[in-house]
């Protein structure tokens, strides 16, 4: 009898410690940026967390690429209606939007990327390129940045996105 009570008590303590740990903020100083661990993380799978990290890392890389492309191609920034590269970058990565921008004539994804390589396009090619890549990647994840237990990404969409990125990078280099 005393052994059963001891096991119950130990189980309750373990459960309480586990639940209280879920409320503590986990802070990482190195590696991929991951949100703090909270109660909502109980409804996430390992694959969901990996997809979140992947989306966030892609966004960070595209943001950095956009900043570098503006530094190397300042003439493209002059074609924009925004005076600084920071404003253009923030507009794409910090503000809420539906990926449809008037200067791209409503084109998103691969259609926006194609504008970059069109000779008669007079707009900001850096914005068209990065906006197209970003919207294509986000579309392959269902335009979500947070994934829970039953969420999934379509493998064919991820594959198509990866192939399109390879083609776009090749075209940019040639």
Model-identified regions with their sequence ranges:
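Mature extracytoplasmic/lumenal regions of exported proteins
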Residues: 109-174
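C-terminal motif of bacterial Sec signal peptides marking the signal peptidase cleavage site
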Residues: 18-21
């Amino acid at each position: 009898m005393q052994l059963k009570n001891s096991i119950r008590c130990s189980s309750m303590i373990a459960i309480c410690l586990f639940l209280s740990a879920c409320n503590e903020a986990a802070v990482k100083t190195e590696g991929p940026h991951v949100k703090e661990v909270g109660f909502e993380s109980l409804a996430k799978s390992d694959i969901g967390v990996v997809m979140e990290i992947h989306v966030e890392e892609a966004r960070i890389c595209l943001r950095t690429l956009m900043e570098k492309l503006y530094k190397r191609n300042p003439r493209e920034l002059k074609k924009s209606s925004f005076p600084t590269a920071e404003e253009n970058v923030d507009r794409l990565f910090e503000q809420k939007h539906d990926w449809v921008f008037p200067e791209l004539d409503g084109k998103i994804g691969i259609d926006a990327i194609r504008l970059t390589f069109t000779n008669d396009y007079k707009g900001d090619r850096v914005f068209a390129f990065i906006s197209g890549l970003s919207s294509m990647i986000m579309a392959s994840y269902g335009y979500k940045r947070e994934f829970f237990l039953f969420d999934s990404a379509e493998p064919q969409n991820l594959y198509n996105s990866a192939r399109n990125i390879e083609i776009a990078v090749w075209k940019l280099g040639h």
